């Protein structure tokens, strides 16, 4: 077995308390936003995960001073950016390994009038367009050129960025973040309609306001931004990762464990707790903690007319697509059936063959839909050898392995390390 694999001996209950790390999706945004000022910015509750560490390395390469204050607190100062780093093979290699690098465009464009972007990496979960980023920035005055020999985009704003009205063609979290970061230093007023309003975007906007930006409508799908000349430094604490919290809930349910999730910021979880309760999972709320008591069985609810429950993803405040894989795997041991409808990505259900090999009863209807017939714990999943295709499916398979009888081996675990 290689070192890029987990060997899991499952079927054992877990117990105790666990505290989630800071939110990965927020971390990538606020790290890029530190480029908008020459002053120091201190970020706390920053998660120690592969994607964040790669972005920190990328910022160091750009000349950002990065000082680690504590295990999860960093001070960053972007007062001496090395634009020549864009021309190096190291930049193209490192930036292409992480999809979050796309959010470097806006702050560099806003401060220096130029930026570069190799084709970004990330999960292989279907088509993920960059059009929303490009069109939004183009309307603010950016010009994009593709350099085929380097496989990268060159972005310039020869006349500077100017505020305008933007109707986003899709609700994109990173697309909204990019446009917001460009607009805060653009001349004039920018209105962004159909903006993403996930807690990650709200947190980014609140941090920018602390830095001196003028943003109205935070938490809604209509943002109004009055450009300013410069931003100052600030201190910002990241929210706990709602995806990690949901993963822990699924882990507790599948392994019949009694687990308490500490400091979960329940007010920021939206409908996530309700969705798990619809799957029959009992949750006890104790202040800002969530206790998942040990359950021998859990039963999926039906709709009022008795029809099969459907769980589907949607932009916030809908159910996050990043927890659909977790929902699918916990359904395998529930009483009852559920239709899992992954609307936003077309390849995230392609790990179900591994669950079927473990003994799950799943019908893959098409790339977006799967029906799960729960085993009701009558037949325990069995351990197998498998590979992690992406972050969220990887954790779902890890949860399945922890609940399964016997030994499982999960390869390609760097995918899990990217987000956990």
Residue spans for each PLM region:
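Short, structured segments at the rim of ligand-binding sites
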Residues: 1-420
């Amino acid at each position: 077995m290689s070192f890029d694999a987990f060997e899991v001996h499952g079927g054992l209950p877990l117990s105790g308390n666990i505290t989630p790390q800071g939110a990965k999706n927020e971390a990538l945004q606020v790290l890029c936003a530190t480029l908008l000022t020459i002053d120091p910015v201190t970020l706390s509750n920053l998660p120690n995960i592969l994607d964040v560490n790669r972005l920190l390395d990328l910022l160091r390469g750009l000349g950002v001073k990065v000082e680690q204050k504590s295990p999860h607190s960093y001070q960053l100062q972007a007062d001496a950016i090395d634009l020549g780093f864009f021309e190096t093979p190291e930049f193209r290699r490192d930036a292409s390994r992480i999809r979050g690098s796309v959010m470097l465009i806006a702050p560099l464009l806003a401060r220096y009038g130029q930026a570069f972007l190799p084709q970004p990496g990330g999960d292989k979960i279907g088509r993920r367009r960059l059009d929303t980023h490009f069109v939004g920035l183009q309307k603010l005055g950016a010009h994009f050129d593709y350099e085929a020999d380097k496989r990268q985009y060159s972005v310039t704003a020869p006349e500077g960025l100017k505020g305008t009205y933007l109707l986003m063609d899709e609700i994109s979290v990173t697309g909204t973040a990019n446009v917001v970061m460009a607009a805060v230093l653009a001349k004039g007023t920018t209105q962004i309609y159909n903006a993403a309003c996930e807690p990650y975007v709200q947190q980014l906007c609140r941090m920018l306001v602390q830095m001196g930006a003028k943003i109205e409508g935070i938490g809604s799908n209509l943002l109004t931004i009055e450009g300013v000349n410069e931003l100052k430094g600030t201190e910002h604490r990241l929210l706990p990762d709602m995806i990690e919290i949901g993963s822990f809930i699924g882990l507790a349910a599948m392994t019949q464990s009694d687990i308490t999730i500490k400091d979960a910021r329940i007010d920021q979880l939206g409908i996530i707790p309700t969705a798990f309760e619809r799957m029959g999972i009992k949750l006890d709320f104790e202040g800002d903690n969530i206790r998942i008591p040990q359950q021998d069985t859990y039963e999926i609810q039906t709709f009022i007319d008795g029809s099969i429950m459907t769980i589907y993803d949607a932009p916030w405040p809908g159910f996050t697509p990043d927890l659909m894989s977790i929902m699918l795997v916990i359904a395998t041991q529930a009483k009852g059936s559920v239709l899992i409808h992954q609307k936003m990505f077309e390849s995230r259900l392609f790990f179900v063959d591994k669950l079927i090999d473990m003994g799950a009863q799943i019908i893959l209807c098409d790339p977006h839909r799967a029906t799960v017939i729960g085993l009701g714990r009558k037949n325990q999943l069995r351990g197998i050898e498998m590979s992690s295709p992406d972050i969220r499916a990887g954790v779902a398979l890890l949860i399945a392995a922890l609940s399964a009888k016997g030994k499982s081996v999960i390869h390609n675990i760097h995918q899990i390390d990217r987000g956990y």
